[in-house]
Amino acid sequence: MAKLTKRMRVIRDKVDVTKQYDINEAVALLKELATAKFVESVDVAVNLGIDARKSDQNVRGATVLPHGTGRSVRVAVFTQGANAEAAKAAGAEFVGMEDLAEQIKKGEMGFDVVIASPDAMRVVGQLGQVLGPRGLMPNPKVGTVTPNVAEAVNNAKAGQVRYRNDKNGIIHTTIGKVDFDSNKLKENLEALLVALKKAKPSQAKGVYIKKVSLSTTMGAGVAVDQSGLNAAAN
């Protein structure tokens, strides 16, 4: 049997895996256990009551967290004309059409989000094999294919998170950094849960949000008692 590290022993002794923690208690515990030499992200896993094998029950979308994610996001935008100027004014680091596509084909991938206006999809479509595996392909379902590219850039910069359930019906995303104020993490979590509720497939039956767990980059998962969250989110 593998020997537990000191960090793993502390987590084992501090975290009750059978308990659902009040949100404030959960965040305090995460902060206590976050001992890495960098500022860890606070990640969330939401188990949904869906049948992920059925395409009409899959959940996908995006929402802007009220307090952002704490990450600096670099944005590439495929567009032209007035939209190109608007994207630059909104803070996009890379803006173009065929010229931007050529950069990407050469392996120049210095961005975290790709946005495209509908008329640019003829160019972006050629990059599916490059952008797709990295989760960067623009998609109207998450607001990254839009005629209003400036708004999409603003959302990305403001802390928009994208979510999509995995094959087990679980959503994985981040809600901030461990050095965020506890109330900001709580409000970010509540905003995400509200967005997930709005995205509930009509075919999903029974309990929809079955379990919510928080963890830090290097830490263990802590189950959250949903009754302590804002009524709109639970």
From Swiss-Prot:
Question: Is Coiled coil one of the keywords UniProt gives this record?
Answer: no
Keyword hit for Ribonucleoprotein: yes
Q: Extract the coiled-coil ranges from the record.
A: none
Look up the record and give one Gene Ontology term from the biological process aspect: regulation of translation
Instruction: Quote the cellular component terms of the Gene Ontology held in the record.
Output: cytosolic large ribosomal subunit
Q: Which PROSITE patterns match?
A: RIBOSOMAL_L1
| InterPro entries reported in the protein's UniProt record | Ribosom_uL1_bac-type, Ribosomal_uL1, Ribosomal_uL1-like, Ribosomal_uL1/biogenesis, Ribosomal_uL1_3-a/b-sand, Ribosomal_uL1_CS
Output the Pfam families linked to this UniProt entry.
Ribosomal_L1
Taxonomic superkingdom: Bacteria
Name the UniProt key words of this record, in alphabetical order.
Repressor, Ribonucleoprotein, Ribosomal protein, RNA-binding, rRNA-binding, Translation regulation, tRNA-binding
Return the SUPFAM superfamilies for the record. Answer: Ribosomal protein L1
Spell out the molecular function terms from Gene Ontology: rRNA binding; structural constituent of ribosome; tRNA binding
Could you tell me what this protein does?
Answer: Binds directly to 23S rRNA. The L1 stalk is quite mobile in the ribosome, and is involved in E site tRNA release.
Q: Which NCBIfam families match?
A: rplA_bact
Complexes and interactors:
Part of the 50S ribosomal subunit.
User: Which HAMAP family does this chain map to?
Assistant: Ribosomal_uL1_B
Similarity field: Belongs to the universal ribosomal protein uL1 family.
> What protein does this entry describe?
Large ribosomal subunit protein uL1
From which organism does this entry originate?
Pectobacterium carotovorum subsp. carotovorum (strain PC1)
Gene it is expressed from: rplA
